[in-house]
């Protein structure tokens, strides 16, 4: 329909609010988070807010300056979280819907060189799941809003790797099953997918298995609408591989031949209603 500017370098992640009124973008190269209005006809409107992350991580590692990799609203639509792998922080911004503005109100300070990459929330809005790229783990938080302030209480940290693994591994993506009782995490470098069961009452994860994905550098994974299959976007090998999930045995069984695609990054699988 049209193009809109974010007044910076290209974004690596975008999301929208539940009302489809605003777009939230994350800038890896410039460490910038941006809010853009969505017009009534669905076209991209004007930029309403922008923030630049500042600071340094460990200068001994490659992630030593701001790199935002995820920007999305909390389920109550009151705050925007911005995951920054460069400075090992998740910055939390209050979101003013009337004006589309974001204001920093809190920071989750993660472990040094953990590289918090992406955060998802449970459908009931009670729990947040944060993957840390360089630590190859998932941090689980209880989330609530108390006196109009965000509260994140960490209740678990669990590895995404198996007993034997590639020491160059980096946790890349996480996805829920449609009923949110299962969580899948891809490990780039290790070239595997970790499969967790999720207790919907406590929010805690139990690791069932970590299995190879028959490709190189799985940057993203997709869960099919039937919750019985997943697809892995293997960036370096230029393939998409497909698997049938055996939940009882905790296994992934390759399903069909890989599809050749040049450096796949992300895909969305949707069920078409007849």
Regions found by a protein language model. Name each.
Residues 2-70:
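Asp-box/WD-like beta-propeller blade repeats and closely related beta-sheet repeat scaffolds
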Residues 10, 67, 115, 170, ...:
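Beta-rich catalytic cores
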Residues 25-28, 74, 82-85, 122, ...:
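Conserved beta-strand positions in repeat-built beta-propeller and related beta-rich domains
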Residues 35-46, 93-101, 141-152, 196-203, ...:
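Short loop/turn segments immediately following beta-strands, especially the blade-tip
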Residues 169-202, 210-232:
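Loop/turn-rich, solvent-exposed surfaces of beta-rich toroidal or solenoidal domains
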């Amino acid at each position: 329909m049209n193009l809109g500017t974010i007044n910076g370098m290209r974004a690596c992640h975008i999301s929208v609010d539940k009302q489809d009124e605003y777009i939230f973008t994350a800038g890896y190269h410039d460490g910038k988070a941006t809010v853009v209005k969505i017009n009534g006809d669905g076209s991209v409107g004007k930029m309403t807010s922008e923030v630049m992350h500042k600071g340094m991580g460990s200068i001994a590692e490659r992630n030593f300056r701001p790199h935002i990799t995820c920007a999305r609203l909390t389920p109550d639509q009151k705050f925007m979280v911005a995951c920054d792998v460069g400075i090992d922080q998740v910055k939390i911004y209050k979101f003013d819907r009337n004006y589309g503005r974001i204001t920093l109100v809190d920071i989750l300070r993660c472990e040094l060189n953990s590289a918090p990459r992406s955060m998802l929330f449970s459908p009931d809005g009670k729990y947040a799941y944060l993957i840390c790229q360089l630590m190859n783990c998932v941090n689980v938080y209880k989330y609530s809003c108390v006196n109009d302030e965000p509260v994140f209480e960490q209740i678990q940290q669990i590895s995404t790797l198996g007993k034997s693994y590639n020491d160059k591994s980096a946790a890349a993506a996480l996805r829920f099953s449609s009923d949110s009782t299962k969580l899948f995490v891809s490990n780039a470098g290790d070239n595997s997918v970790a499969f967790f069961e999720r207790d919907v009452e406590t929010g805690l994860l139990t690791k069932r298995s970590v299995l190879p994905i028959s490709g190189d550098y799985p940057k993203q994974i997709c869960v099919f609408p039937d919750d019985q299959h997943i697809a892995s976007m293997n960036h370096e090998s230029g393939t998409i591989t497909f698997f049938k999930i055996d939940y009882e045995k905790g296994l992934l069984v390759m399903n069909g031949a890989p599809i050749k695609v040049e450096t796949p990054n992300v895909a969305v699988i949707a069920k078409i209603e007849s």
